[in-house]
Structures are given as C-alpha cells and as structure tokens.
Amino acid sequence: MRKLFLTGVFAAIVSVPAISVAAPDGKNRKVTVANMSNHVLRELYASPVTAKTWEEDMLGQRTLASGKTISANIDNGTNECYYDLKGVMDNGRTVEERNVNVCAASKWVIGETSDSVQ
C-alpha cells in the first residue's frame, strides 16, 4: 500500500510555521482541516479516489480538538489531485467527503451536523 506523507506541521498543536515540500508537478495539495464539531477528531484519512482501501491514519497518535485546525500536505507522490477524505470522531461518527480536488480545495470544515470543502 502506498504511504501517504503528512508534511505539514500540526499548527494547532505546535506553534511553528508549517513546513511543506512542493509536489514534483508544482501543484499544491495542502488542505486545512478545521474541526468545528463538538467532538475530538481521532482519525484522519486521505486516499486517492483510485485506491480500493483507505491509506494510513494521518493523525497517528495525535487528535484534533474541537475548534482547532491542522494543515496537511496531501501528496503521496502519484501526482493525483482527486482524493476521498475521511474523519472519525471520538463519539464514533464517521465523516467523509468523496472526490475532492485537493489541488484546488484549500479547506475541509467538519461541523457538528454537516461538512464542507472550500
């Protein structure tokens, strides 16, 4: 399974500037994930739409508290722009956004009852 690299720094946790590496094709795949729900985001996945399974959890041992954001460079080296995004909250709720153009979208807002990609 291809590895998904998270090269952005978790801005909500660490107060240092985000570090990112430009993709070989020059396209920005950096997406800000904003947790505007009342729950903690426990898991975060981003997989190319062509993948049959979810890539590894991008948060690892970390979580994203309510009201916080992270910045992630979603680039697994395939030069793909269309990804499926998935989050798992601490209450078991799963949120998904399918077929997201991460080369154009810059923010995924996870709300209490709805989600949006901007």
Language-model-derived ranges and their functions:
Residues 27-31, 70:
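Structural beta-strand segments of beta-rich domains
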Residues 93-118:
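Extracellular beta-sheet/turn segments enriched in Thr/Pro/Gly and aliphatic residues
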Residues 31-40:
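Asparagine-centered strand-capping/turn motif at beta-strand->loop junctions
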Residues 1-4:
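Positively charged n-region of N-terminal signal peptides that target proteins for export
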Residues 80-89:
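A short, solvent-exposed beta-strand micro-motif common in secreted/extracellular proteins
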Residues 20-24:
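Boundary at the C-terminal end of the N-terminal hydrophobic targeting segment
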Residues 6-18:
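Hydrophobic helical h-region of N-terminal Sec-dependent signal peptides
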Residues 52-78:
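Intrinsically disordered, low-complexity Pro/Gly/Ser/Thr-rich segments with frequent PxxP/GP/PP motifs
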